[in-house]
Amino acid sequence: LTADPEINVARVVSRVSDGGHDVPAEKIRSRYDKALALVKELIAVCDVCHIYDNSLSAPYRIFKKRKERCWYCTQRRLWHKEDIAALTGIKNAERAALNQKK
């Protein structure tokens, strides 16, 4: 996901300038909101779930669920604990460094 639907709109504009297909901006915005609304349901039915922010050039994991345990990472400042809780419906996630190379 991205932190803002306007990022997705800009990416489609860029794709079109490279010869790719277009998607109306309003369609992108409505799909963005619909997709975010489904995140809570998705997490509820998954034993393992990772959510990545693709707002910048490299994906960045902001949430991880494994069985009944959940973690969040807010190192990028685009996402705060409250934002992740609102997105996922999980308020008791633990803070962790989810993006360190092993």
What are these regions (language model features)?
Residues 42-102:
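NTP-dependent small-molecule kinase module
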Residues 1-36:
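A glycine- and Lys/Arg-enriched "phosphate-lid" helix/loop adjacent to the NTP-binding pocket
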Residues 37-41:
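A charged, well-structured terminal subsegment
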